[in-house]
Structures are given as structure tokens and as C-alpha cells.
Amino acid sequence: MPESSQGPSVSSQLPEFNAAPGDFVGVDRCRSCHKEEVIEFQKTTHSKLTFPGKDYIQGCETCHGPGKAHSDAVQAAHGDDAAIAEALKKYPMFSFRSTAEENAARCLTCHTSSKQQDFFAHSEHAGHGISCNQCHATHLVDEVKDQSKGDLSYPQGYFFQLPKLADETRWLHNSLLKQSEPDVCFGCHRTLQAEFALPVHHRVPEGLMKCTDCHNPHGTLNTANLRKPGWETCVNCHVEKRGPYIYEHPAVKVEGCVTCHNPHGSTNRMLLVRREGRQLCLQCHTGFHTQAQVPHSRLGYQTSGECVRCHVAIHGSNFDPDYLR
């Protein structure tokens, strides 16, 4: 949960929360009709949130708004279905089945830290009408089984062990995701799911990486909601390619790693977008090159030749402007 929603109270900016304290009835009144929902809800962090008034209001009404008029009208119907339906229509509570914009506005009233509120309205998800509750559940996903925190560190000398991640039910609960990653993402991103099924892929399906390691689903100022711009996302893990180099390869720094690599999956080695590496080079290097006035054809630049036979430092070099070493 964001820092602003972890304290003893959360002040809301929504107009209805300017209602008089007497307009709020408390969770016990909600339970009289919505027993299962309240039992589920009270296991979550959301159930502990409050906002200030004459008395601190806590529970369902923190998100759904004051419930007195709604509750009184339903009770006055005395079990008559038609009267209840009319009461619900006349005195509705906020429903997260509303529009994506209304749902997001409700959540972002509290979730304002880490630039979430600033960027989400301009994110690709928001632009496509994706609301918070399509990925997150406002009530409980699963009860926490393991209170210990995950340990992502490796013991000294062990470089190929799988990281010990937090118990799945713990981080599902903490972020209230309806499904674990990557399943929650694959629900919409079917094409990317197919790419991750290709023989060479980043280890997202195996659980060694998450989509959110590279992307921020709540929005950033970068293409594809990347956490860092361009190649910086990649070198966050591939540190040996970071540089800086005296002789930078413009394809890396200007266009980025995706010029040559498909980060999600490929049928080619090293996630290359082309089967033969030389085909990648020829996308940019279209002219007739010579080295010391000797045509490349005499140096093995033929159908079966690979540029990296000689240009071994293709990501950048501190020694040679032609990336020969």
C-alpha cells in the first residue's frame, strides 16, 4: 500500500465525504445485508483505513461513501423486492462497476504516492479504459499465510540459485492483485504471452522475473510504460553492457536494445529479431565498407559471414572505433 494509506487515517477529497458524521452507519450496518463481503473485506488492509470527521469513519464507507440513506431506504422496504430495487436506485452506493475513470478517481484519492496519481491518468492503461479494479481486487484475494518477507539476495559464492521470493499469497494480498504475475498481465496481453512461449525468452513464465521489473503498469513518461527510458531498463540487469564507452554504438544509445533484440521472446539465439546477426547490421550499415582499403568480401563478408567475427565489441568499445575489440 502507498505510504499515504498506511497511517491511522486517510483524508478523502471526494465531495460525498463532506457529509455529516450522522450519514455514516458503520460496518455493522453493512454486515446486516452484505455478510460475506464484510467478512472477506475485514481481512484486508483497506478495512483498516479511516478518514476524519466528527468521528473517524472506518470500513466499507471509506470507499463506498456514506450509507445511512441507502440502508434506511432498504430497511423501510420491509423485504419487498420492488421497493428494495427502487430504494437502491434512489439511494445508490458507489459501485466499482462504474466507469474506468470513476473507479480510478476513487482509488487515486488515497493512492497518491510514488507519482501514481500524476502518471496514471496519462498512462496507456488509462487511455484504453483500464481501471484499477480490472487488475486489483478491492477486497481480499487470499489470506496471508507467510508473514516473512522474501529474500532476494544470493548467498556469497552461489550465482545460479533461484531467488527466494516472498510467499505468493503474501504479495498477492499486499498488492491485491486478482491474479499473480504474469497471468494478470496475460489476461489482456495475449500477443506477449505467445512471445514468452517462444524457445528463447526472458524467464517471466518461470517466475524468475516479473513484467513489473521492466514496466510500471501505473504509467511513466517512457515508451511502453518502461520504468527507465530505453536501454537503461535493460542495463539495469545487463550491467556488463552499460558502459560508458569511449566509442559508443549509436544503435544502442539512440534507438535502444530493441533494435536488435526482442525482449519478450524469439526463436533466435540471444533474443535477436533476425536469425542471422549480419542481417541486423545491414539494416543500418547499407553502404560498401572497406577496412584498410580492402573490400569486406575479401575478409569473409559473404553469405555465411558474420560481422561479429571481427566486430566483437558491438555494444561499445574503449579501444577501437570500429568495435574490433
PLM feature segments, named:
Residues M1-R325:
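Short sequence/structural segments immediately N-terminal
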